[in-house]
Amino acid sequence: MTRDRSNLLYEDAGRFIPGGVNSPVRSGRAVGTNPIFIREAKGCYLWDEDGNRYVDFVASWGPLIVGHAHPAVVEAVRAAVEKGTSYGIPTEIEVRMARKVVEMVPSIEMVRMVNSGTEATMSAIRLARGYTGRPGIIKFNGCYHGHGDCLLVKAGSGLATFGIPGSPGVPEEVVRHTIPLSYNDLDEVESVMERDGDRIAAIILEPVAANMGLVLPRPGFLEGLRKLCDKHGALLIFDEVITGFRLARGGAQEFFGVTPDLTCLGKIIGGGLPVGAYGGRRDIMMKMAPVGNVYQAGTLSGNPLAMAAGLATLDLLCEDGVYESLEEKTNHLVDGLNEAAGAAGVPVFTSRIASLGCGFFTSEPVFDFASALASNTDAYAVFFREMLNRGVYFAPAQFEAFFLSMAHESKDLDFTIEAAGNAFVRVKELCAF
């Protein structure tokens, strides 16, 4: 499998784009390879500029739960773009999208559209501080909430991949009100809340941490956070940019039965186009301008193309049997990968939930950021390259999840499992455990 065209494009991109990519993890540096450049995608398949085909388990980092270029989504965008690309004036489709989100997500009574998950979390933090009159924010090590300054502390995703604890350019004064704690350690949170609860505006977290690989909440962790927020008058914010509409129609809050005060959304809600949203209780959301005095705005917020793609995607997810089918596919894939790793004698701890999964190259359980970081990233790099050469595209970094879509079929999963069997053999040959 040759990638001459991709390599030439990457070299050319480096002349004009820092690192040759518009988001760091895409570079492939964490797995010792150049990125592939994509020409087109359909269903669960990618084709690169050299004509190589890959079974895709990245799905644009999560948004494409219905698959690439689903006919219903394509037609919705086509119909919208023929009327115009952006107006900067309210449209009916924004109202339809807002109504749909309120119907689907248990905690959301009102919602505001933005253009990215980062905008959603930044806005939710500002709103929480404005509503409570408090400055403090608790976040969790390894949880990634976009690249807003106050949350870029001990974060996951690309910062974990490249070993960056924070970022130059973020002054200490900006993050001094941010308290990073250990995910899944309820006792630590309780201790901080007992000491500083009267200055904590909110606790924000990914209810399932999907930016340090995939780490599930321990039983009682989310429920405990809800109780602590209620006790101390803080808001609970779920960052459901990844889990929203993926774990269930109502996201992780429906899946676990825990209701936050505010919810941040992105990825799936845009159907593959740039979009984000934040919403929650009516009394909190009514603090936003123009009815309240907490300010947030955006030139392209509620963009009609993104609303059209998102609505078409959400309509597809409301069909019968979608989530049951996705979970069945995920179990089939993960069981096959585990069996292949075991046969090759490669230690892998696999985490899965709904249509999300991650294989950590370690024999120890992974339950927080520290245990995730203890996994063998060199082994993952070998696995990634071997799978890529066999026509399967996983995330080019250990600390990212893989995603299944409605477009994956049994033949694609079986193809992937067979490829993994050979890849794990190579991992065993090349890596020390």
UniProtKB/Swiss-Prot annotation:
Coiled-coil-forming residues are: none
Alphabetical UniProt keywords: Cytoplasm, Isomerase, Porphyrin biosynthesis, Pyridoxal phosphate
EC class of this enzyme?
isomerase
The family database entries (CDD domains) matched by this protein are listed as: OAT_like
User: Which residues are annotated with the PTM N6-(pyridoxal phosphate)lysine?
Assistant: K267
Family membership, please give it: Belongs to the class-III pyridoxal-phosphate-dependent aminotransferase family. HemL subfamily.
NCBIfam families, alphabetized: hemL (TIGR00713), PRK00062.1 (NF000818)
Q: What does the subunit comment say?
A: Homodimer.
Protein name listed in UniProt: Glutamate-1-semialdehyde 2,1-aminomutase
What species does this protein belong to?
Syntrophobacter fumaroxidans (strain DSM 10017 / MPOB)
